[in-house]
């Protein structure tokens, strides 16, 4: 919201003047960014390795809307042993939607990122370079988010588990929506790759390998017009509950 509220919003709606402090404070509740990224990177070897013979087998998780006690989420222990956690193969989530142009391009970016990590991993010096690790972690996080989105999409589109009436209602989700979402992912991955390429501590091998991630999303003019028209049709339709 902070990024999209124009100056006129502050002039016409005094609520924003009061809300800006809370809007910008919300990310702080999630913790310090560089600490979280450092923790995320501990998962990276096991996560990427799951597609290369190191996969663990876990049961599929369906949509949960039952009245169960999830209080364990608020009683998390210390962040120890993260690098030893195993993951299932992430490829099936992407294979299901591989026919969508931008999902396919994003998958190419993942392969290029994996090649970068395997052939030119962070050096001992870079392990202490927060600027380098921040960008590397952002690249990795995009992959994980992409998998989660596609897994939820498959539950909705294939199994009809759309969670109607919830904040995660996916009743109207279509494959064109997914393709448009991943157009953003492709662009963001490319942006982060360029940043990593320009890092002062990046080796020549890393700078060359990371350029393999730079891709351009495929935007169909007719599909884009349909998407924008749909987005604009939602303007003014939201009604706050009294």
Residue ranges and their predicted role:
Residues 1-242:
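Flavin-dependent oxidoreductase catalytic core characteristic
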